[in-house]
UniProtKB/Swiss-Prot annotation:
The keyword DNA damage applies. The keyword Cytoplasm does not apply. This is DNA repair protein RecO. GO terms for cellular component: bacterial nucleoid. Keywords: DNA damage, DNA recombination, DNA repair. It comes from Flavobacterium psychrophilum (strain ATCC 49511 / DSM 21280 / CIP 103535 / JIP02/86). Belongs to the RecO family.
Length: 238
């Protein structure tokens, strides 16, 4: 089936000398993997290696056989060029980290237009703003809405957040956050991209929240792996 859709690049792995295997989250079909022959060749101008940087938003034409095999692009172009993401060291570190998180989190080949729209909007926000220290934390938490384990916030007056059940509790269990960690987590829940500058988190608080979120993903996603770029991200925001 021939399709034309938007796609967000999740990962690109070199195959042999000149080719790539590119994983994309598409608007039309969810997660798809593509084989790009001669991606490193200057002759193939419509499928340049530069198009497949982490979280680049593409317009693609492709043939989807939907047989669980690698698909093929017919045409690829940048949907909306980023102005700063791939040129700013901090922003590029963030997108590498987020792309790793998504690589280990999205597994289903099914359409999720709401999730795609959220990611696209968030990336444009990142590209157009400079006060971004809380961006990765907000995105990780908001992403859990689309992955199916957003915290139950009906009882936030309780002092402990229980990680395995994803809810606030009056009792402390083995998998609960401490009271201090829970208060920080509540603070994060109240943050949105547009109000993140008025609700300042200190660098140590960000480090605590990042650890909480990585652990939370590990509790709720089978086979979730800690991103290799995590330590670099910690250094950036230390």
């Amino acid at each position: 089936m021939q399709i034309k859709t938007k796609a967000i690049v999740i990962s690109a792995i070199k195959y042999q000398e000149k080719s790539l295997i590119v994983k994309c989250f598409t608007l039309s079909d969810g997660l798809k993997s593509y084989f790009v022959r001669d991606a490193f060749s200057s002759k193939k101008s419509n499928q340049k290696i530069a198009y497949f940087q982490p979280l680049t938003i593409l317009e693609i034409e492709a043939v989807h056989k939907n047989k669980g095999t690698l698909e093929r692009f017919k045409e690829v172009k940048i949907a909306t060029p980023f102005h700063s993401i791939h040129y700013d060291v901090i922003k590029s570190t963030i997108v590498i980290f987020i792309s790793e998180i998504l690589h280990h989190s999205i597994h289903e080949e099914e359409k999720n237009e709401a999730f795609f729209t959220f990611l696209e909007t968030a990336l444009h926000w990142l590209d157009n703003h400079d006060q971004i220290a809380n961006f990765h934390l907000i995105l990780l938490l908001e992403t859990t809405k689309y992955l199916g384990f957003y915290p139950d916030i009906s009882n936030t007056e309780h002092p402990f957040f229980e990680m395995t059940e994803g809810l606030f509790s009056p009792f402390h269990a083995i998998s609960s956050l401490t009271e201090h960690e829970t208060n920080l987590f509540k603070k994060l829940i109240d943050l949105k991209f547009d109000n993140s500058n008025t609700n300042t988190l200190h660098s140590t608080e960000r480090q605590i929240l990042l650890k909480i979120l990585i652990n939370y993903y590990s509790y709720h996603l089978d086979g979730f792996k800690k991103p290799k770029s995590l330590e670099v991200l910690k250094e950036v925001f230390s």
